[in-house]
């Protein structure tokens, strides 16, 4: 992800240190790796880290592997949310953020509802990282362009990686 400051065109690369982060559809293999990476970083971490999915068994497994207690010992408030069992996932996730939305949102499934939820929970200068590569060349999802213009929200895609990425993730 990246962030900006109003009046400046300089991009601050990476998640917002001490910010609010959400990982949607985040308990598959790549999501588990992401949770591990976020919880073990020494240089930068969110204060709030919300991980969602619609599969309770997978959420339970993630919560066993990466406990709230371990996250708390690292200064991170970790929450697991089954968005398939709440009436309004966007409202629930925004409430968890304290109503401000999230600084960094990662969408880990090429599913229209996931991407649209990601867009709808962004806070000011929020970055949506579309990590999951769709195979459908016609894949689309709605985006609030009012928020892009007036709220400085932005979307980026992540695909592949390089040797430096692998070395960093293994540290």
List where the protein language model places each region.
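Mid-domain Rossmann-like dinucleotide-binding core that forms the NAD(H)/NADP(H) cofactor-binding site
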Residues: 1-85
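C-terminal hydrophobic helical "lid"/dimerization subdomain
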Residues: 70, 86-92, 116-120, 124, ...
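A short acidic, Gly/Pro-enriched loop at the edge of an enzyme's catalytic core
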Residues: 87-105
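Short, well-ordered alpha-helical microsegments
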Residues: 31, 59, 114-116, 166
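ADP-ribose/adenylate-binding Rossmann-like module
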Residues: 104-111, 120-141, 154-155
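Glycine- and other small-residue-rich loops at beta-strand/loop junctions that grip anionic moieties
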Residues: 23-27, 51-52, 81-83, 103-108, ...
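A generic alpha-to-beta junction signature in SAM-dependent methyltransferases
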Residues: 15, 42-43, 97, 121-123
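C-terminal substrate-binding/catalytic core of Rossmann-like NAD(P)-dependent dehydrogenases/reductases
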Residues: 90-95, 136-171
């Amino acid at each position: 992800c990246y962030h900006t400051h109003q009046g400046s065109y300089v991009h601050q690369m990476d998640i917002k240190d001490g910010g609010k982060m959400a990982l949607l559809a985040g308990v598959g293999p790549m999501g588990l790796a992401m949770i591990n990476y976020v919880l073990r970083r020494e240089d930068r971490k969110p204060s709030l880290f919300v991980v969602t999915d619609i599969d309770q068994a997978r959420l339970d497994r993630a919560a066993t592997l990466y406990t709230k207690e371990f996250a708390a010992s690292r200064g991170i408030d970790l929450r697991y949310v089954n968005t398939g069992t709440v009436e309004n996932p966007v409202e629930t996730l925004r409430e968890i953020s304290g109503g401000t939305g999230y600084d960094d949102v990662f969408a880990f499934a090429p599913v229209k509802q996931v991407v649209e939820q990601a867009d709808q929970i962004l806070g000011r200068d929020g970055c949506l990282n579309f990590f999951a590569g769709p195979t459908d060349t016609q894949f689309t999802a709605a985006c609030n362009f009012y928020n892009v213009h007036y709220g400085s929200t932005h979307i980026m895609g992540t695909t592949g990686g390089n040797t430096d990425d692998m070395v960093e993730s293994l540290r």
